[in-house]
Regions:
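Glycine-rich, flexible N-terminal cofactor/catalytic loop recognition
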Residues: 1-59
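A contiguous loop/helix-start segment that scaffolds small-molecule binding in enzyme catalytic cores
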Residues: 2, 157-228
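Short active-site oxyanion
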Residues: 26-32, 107-110, 158-159
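Conserved helicase motor
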Residues: 56-62, 138-140
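Class I SAM-dependent methyltransferase SAM-binding "motif I" and its flanking Rossmann-like core
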Residues: 95-155
Length: 228
């Protein structure tokens, strides 16, 4: 009997954004692979889902991947989730999917159970109407960061990236220093789908000033869009 790995999107804030198919998938899976078992437990408890969880995160090594592959080889149904949103986008899910494809090939099925993505939500709310854009995820903290910043400045396409509350002010300081052409529009989305969802529009300098006044109270993840 062949196993199956399903890539399941989960809410990025509002638990009501869970799809019916995702709920059924999590209930029927033999195990749920999750980035942080404590975060996923909150979601599972809300929907009274009793499926056992297995941690899989950025520090999981080959032994953990081998264990997951063994489960698939024995016919188990596994659901992969991230802390929020769609697995494989700026999280370790992609590494696992790649390893499963490499080691098992067509011996098992890999399916997508799509749903919420902070990337898609922010782009749709921007009002820009992005036909093409460059997505950079989270910029590296040190090595390669300056190269990526130059790429943002020189890209012919609009750019979308993620940032945490700990580094959003630093990022905007760096964007301000890049000296974009006059009229360059930036949108920063914060706490998407949550109670305190908010948006900032303007130049990097204008948004930096707005966020600096609230720096001590900044929470959540940020999506930054730079229109070209």
């Amino acid at each position: 009997m062949s196993g199956i790995l399903r890539i399941v999107a989960t809410p990025i804030g509002n638990l009501e954004d869970m799809t019916l198919r995702a709920l059924r998938t999590l209930k029927e899976a033999d195990f749920i692979l999750c980035e942080d078992t404590r975060t996923t437990k909150h979601l599972l408890d809300h929907y009274q889902i009793k499926t056992s969880t297995i941690s899989y995160h950025q520090h999981s090594g080959e032994l953990k991947i081998d264990r997951i592959i063994d489960l698939l080889n024995t016919g188990k149904s596994l659901a992969l989730v991230t802390d929020a949103g769609t697995p494989g986008i700026s999280d370790p899910g992609g590494k696992l999917v790649s390893a499963v494809r490499e080691k098992l090939g067509n011996a098992i099925k890999i399916e997508s159970v799509p749903g919420v993505s902070a990337l898609a939500a922010a782009v749709s709310l921007s009002g820009v109407g992005f036909d093409r854009f460059l997505f950079l995820g989270f910029l590296p903290h040190k090595k390669g960061r300056q190269t990526m910043l130059k790429q943002i400045l020189t890209s012919e396409y609009s750019v979308v990236l993620y940032e945490s509350k700990h580094r959003i002010v630093k990022l905007l300081e760096e964007l301000s220093a890049l000296k974009f052409p006059d009229g360059t529009e930036v949108m920063v989305a914060r706490e998407l789908t949550k109670l305190f969802e908010s948006f900032y529009f303007g130049s990097p300098e204008e948004i930096l000033t707005a966020l600096q006044s609230k720096e001590s109270n900044l929470k959540g993840e940020f999506v930054v869009l730079i229109k070209k």
